[in-house]
Amino acid sequence: MLIDRFESLEAYFASPYVAGVSERLRIENKILEHGDAGLHAHCWACSRVEQLKINPVRTEYGLQWREALRCPQCMLTARKRFGLHLLAESMQPGAPPPYLTEQVSYSYVAARKHWPKLVASEFLPTLTQRLVQSQKLKFLTRSLRANARHEDMTALTLGDASIGGMLSMDVLEHIADTPAVLREARRVLVPGSPFIITAPFLNGSQSTSVRAVQEADGSIRHLLEPEYHGDPLDPAGVLCFYHFGWDLLDGLRNAGFARAEMVFPWDPHFGYLSEQNAFVAFA
């Protein structure tokens, strides 16, 4: 996988990666011409070439490929495939199984084929939620033994230094207490293991945009227009607290991670085009 890595905003802006944006856009516009023929690319999750659906979202900033290029076999979009691919490439040889912060999803089904002893969970604080999602999981995995696991990312039940990697895809922005999540991730990871985060990212901003805060009494105070993201577990959606800036790297370092960086893949061979990125920190 072709990927660029940066430890600061300054290094990012001074890089050939930023200078090469015009050429990448030229190639992506050529890919658009494939239309219904799709993009033939290697799906990491399926371990074979598939015809990915070309359906980028057009925004005021250009084409958004993050949730596009879905594989017709595993059903994973580019963002999901990239997250799992990056996790596999970042883990240490012989490491314990990783932890995925989602379970009732196609990502979990795909990940389990690569890590049979994978740990995975959802945020399901009530018994009713756990029962409902367990039924969905049984259908998704075609296993009557499947049960949804509840975890609060600010207070994990996992043991210290017990997992070989952690992948959180578009979850962190929905949790008010970011520092608690980062501390817990560092606690449960084996030294040298990766914590990989995908989340809304302001690639030109050092500072995180705080959209809402949770008060001591549990109430929510909105600082910006409320933004709700689609949630497969809740049709009402889930509130977004943050659009992260480069300062999340400092937060990871302050939580005890030895190294933190922002990574940007761009590799048509795997179906990873513009707007893919992830925070990566090593315990």
Question: Where do the language-model regions lie?
Answer:
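Hydrophobic beta-strand segment of the Class I
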Residues: 166-167
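S-adenosyl-L-methionine-dependent methyltransferase catalytic module, highlighting the catalytic core
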Residues: 4-19, 27-41, 141-143, 148-150, ...
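Conserved N-terminal segment of class I S-adenosyl-L-methionine
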Residues: 1-155, 159-161, 212, 267-282
